[in-house]
Amino acid sequence: MGYPGKNHKQYQTPKRPFELSRIEEETRLVIEYGLRNKREVWIAKGALRKYRKAAREIIALQSTGSEQARVERKKDELIGSLQRSGMLSENADIDDVLALKVEQQLDRRLQTQVYRRGFARSPKQARQFITHGHIAIGGRRVTIPGYTVSAKEQEEISYAGSSPLVSDIHSERQRIAKVGR
């Protein structure tokens, strides 16, 4: 265990730094989701790695015949957490956790949600709006593009009250409306 007051890496770098297929896939994700660099892809992969590891541990506990109540509680906690975040459907199973893709994790980012819900013309513009404080969730300004939006918060995304973009006559809002048609 490290010192809690010190920041640590939240990602692991690839074991093979010059693997062409991985580089092309990461580049595609960076372009498609408007990410700043490949480190953001690695962070998303790290989060998925954590979920998959927990799912494998639950499956191992089931196969060894451990306390069934404890196994069910852990399973319900993991699946419930992923359902609240919007990554799994209501009738999901532990196998669905193992089948998660990095795109599903990246789709839950605030930057992606702002772009997909039509608040920005591109993922890069969505990132800019977020960092400049133009986007709020439930009336609370959020300035972190990598913020994971839960399924409940998804409907509460809007322009911040103090942002000039709140006005429908703002020139950028009109450009966004033209692109949306």
Swiss-Prot record:
Biological process according to GO: ribosomal small subunit biogenesis; translation
A family per Pfam: S4
rRNA-binding as UniProt keyword: yes
GO cellular component: small ribosomal subunit
Gene3D superfamilies xref list: RNA-binding S4 domain
Alphabetized UniProt keyword annotations: Ribonucleoprotein, Ribosomal protein, RNA-binding, rRNA-binding
Residues of the S4 RNA-binding domain: 108-172
An MF annotation (GO) of this entry: structural constituent of ribosome
Subunit annotation: Part of the 30S ribosomal subunit. Contacts protein S5. The interaction surface between S4 and S5 is involved in control of translational fidelity.
Record family assignment: Belongs to the universal ribosomal protein uS4 family.
Function: One of the primary rRNA binding proteins, it binds directly to 16S rRNA where it nucleates assembly of the body of the 30S subunit. With S5 and S12 plays an important role in translational accuracy.
The protein's name in its UniProt record: Small ribosomal subunit protein uS4
